[in-house]
């Protein structure tokens, strides 16, 4: 049996800082503006493994741009808001049902967080054709971008995009599926919980995807 985590953990800020670029002499590189906190499985003492990745990614979005936990709703509050809005049926609060980008955008508006703008990528497209949108987003003050799909239902956040000299495209991924008490960002980087990945290896051709872009109101 895995030991329970403490009820409150010290959340780490801007855990991508210090990562090297994914290729030598990149043609283009764009990173998010502002600051964020890394929310992950169990970071508030609630064992949400297997269903909470969307909520944790949403909490990371809510912590932007100041990188502060004040005002970031907990999982019960997020579920209660979705139930109160009529997006989810009675009894959703306290369940282990996951959420995606559509629910995240509703919660961002409900709680007065950063603005969430949705983008749908059809099955088989991957990120093809959206690289320019991401470059524009990150170079004009945009925050983290939540990603989720159907066949690939593991929510994650995009923090940046990079194009190599040979036209290979990479995205900077923040993975909320970590369980434990991270000591520092170097530990997370070494284990791959935040890092650059090739677009073609991240996006499943059998899945559609939704993206939720965050911006200041």
UniProtKB/Swiss-Prot annotation:
| Keywords from the UniProt entry | Cytoplasm, Hydrolase, Protease, Thiol protease, Ubl conjugation pathway
Per its UniProt entry, which superkingdom is the organism in?
A: Eukaryota
Q: Where in the cell is it found?
A: Cytoplasm, Cytosol
Q: Which GO terms describe its molecular function?
A: deUFMylase activity
List cellular component terms (GO): cytosol
Any single Pfam family the record assigns to this protein: Peptidase_C78
**What does the UniProt entry list as the effect of changing residue 177 to A?**
Abolished isopeptidase activity
InterPro entries under this entry?
A: UfSP1/2_DUB_cat
Active-site residues are 53, 175, 177
Entry similarity comment: Belongs to the peptidase C78 family.
Q: What is this protein called?
A: Ufm1-specific protease 1
Specify the species.
Mus musculus
């Amino acid at each position: 049996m895995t030991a329970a985590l403490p009820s409150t953990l010290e959340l780490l800020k801007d855990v991508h800082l210090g990562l090297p670029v994914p290729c030598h002499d990149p043609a283009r590189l764009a990173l998010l503006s502002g600051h964020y906190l890394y929310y992950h499985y169990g970071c508030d003492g609630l064992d949400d493994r297997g269903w909470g990745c969307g909520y944790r990614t949403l909490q990371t979005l809510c912590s932007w741009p100041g990188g502060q936990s004040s005002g970031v709703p907990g999982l019960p509050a997020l579920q209660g808001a979705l139930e109160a809005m009529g997006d989810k049926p009675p009894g959703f609060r306290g369940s282990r049902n996951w959420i995606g980008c559509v629910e995240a955008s509703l919660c961002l508006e409900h709680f007065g967080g950063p603005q969430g703008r949705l983008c749908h990528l059809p099955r088989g497209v991957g990120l093809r054709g959206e690289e320019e949108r991401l470059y524009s987003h990150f170079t004009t003050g945009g925050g983290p971008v939540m990603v989720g799909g159907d066949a690939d239902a593991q929510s994650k956040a995009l923090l940046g995009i990079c194009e190599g000299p040979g036209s290979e495209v990479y995205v900077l991924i923040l993975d909320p599926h970590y369980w434990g008490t991270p000591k520092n960002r170097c530990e997370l980087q070494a284990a791959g919980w935040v890092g650059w990945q090739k677009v073609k290896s991240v996006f499943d051709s059998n899945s559609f995807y939704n993206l939720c872009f965050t911006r200041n109101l």
